[in-house]
Amino acid sequence: MVDHEGEDSSPTDGFGHIPVLLHRADELLGPALTVNDPQGGGAVMIDATLGLGGHSEHFLRTYPQLRLIALDRDPHALEIAGGRLAPFADRITFVHTRYDGIEDALDQAGLPAQESVHGILFDLGVSSMQLDESDRGFAYSIDAPLDMRMDPTTGITAAEVLNTYSHGDLARILSTYGEERFAGKIASEIVRQRAKEPFTTSAALVELLYRSIPAATRRTGGHPAKRTFQALRVEVNGELDSLRAAVPAALDALTVGGRVVFMSYQSLEDRVVKQEITPRSKSKSPEGLPVELPGMGPEFRILTRGAERASEQEVEENPRSAPVRLRAAERIARRSAA
């Protein structure tokens, strides 16, 4: 969730962030939120990745009768967003959970886990707030403790991964989660270095990565630390496992006519989203039949042509939106009893 917060009428707000693809998200979710009332009366929306609350604030202002369920695993984000969204507190249920906690969040809000929600938004990945907080260890441009936990109250740190994982496991996560070509070489260097001195801060890791990646690749492949930091963050936070559970839970939660928007920032996330929504947007009837068999039709229709990208203008105003891939779907039929 590269959390680009901001007012919908200006590039940035007092928080200094811009919500990514804000107007496109509204364009896609708005019809579902206003199906019964142009002010959002009777509609329930889930912001599965609240962050600093920029997207949520826009929807709460635009639809003054909308009910919002706001999820985030970062207690600090919930605290900041809670203050920001205080004027709308009577319409919000805040839940401290990962985005695969949708079912429990709905239970806390007194709603069933299936077909009770009209709109859901996922803005995946690390938030701008987390990148900008120097003590969190997410940014390779800042020397900081190697933590990388989105919820700093639980779980292992990036330093623990570096200092305790076997060579094979390190190479696996670097290759799988970071799509790093030099995963084996980097893993060997990590094991060699930690035998001399355990990793504690990001500067030592960045220095190692500069040594490990060939100069020719560094010149053309972006910052040498980018892929390794991504891989560590995904491993520390269990991001892909969480997403694999969250997408079907979100689809199940939508009522007929309800819509979901996913904004991914890396190919791994986008692949998970696509793999989950595509099968449920296809007929299950045998090919060649003149009519659709009862209960075998598609549950969803895809609202986007492939994965949409940010416009040149948006990227210019907000460089962190450059990698975004947006997909959206609408429930068109109830889930088959089968």
From Swiss-Prot:
Its EC number is 2.1.1.199. One of its GO terms (molecular function) is rRNA (cytosine-N4-)-methyltransferase activity. It is found in: Cytoplasm. This is Ribosomal RNA small subunit methyltransferase H. It comes from the Bacteria. It is an enzyme of class 2 (transferase). Specifically methylates the N4 position of cytidine in position 1402 (C1402) of 16S rRNA. S-adenosyl-L-methionine binds at G53, G54, H55, D72, Y99, D123, Q130. Pfam families: Methyltransf_5 (PF01795). GO terms for biological process: rRNA base methylation. It catalyses: cytidine(1402) in 16S rRNA + S-adenosyl-L-methionine = N(4)-methylcytidine(1402) in 16S rRNA + S-adenosyl-L-homocysteine + H(+). Residues 276-297, 304-323 are annotated as: Disordered. GO terms for cellular component: cytoplasm. Keywords: Cytoplasm, Methyltransferase, rRNA processing, S-adenosyl-L-methionine, Transferase. Belongs to the methyltransferase superfamily. RsmH family.
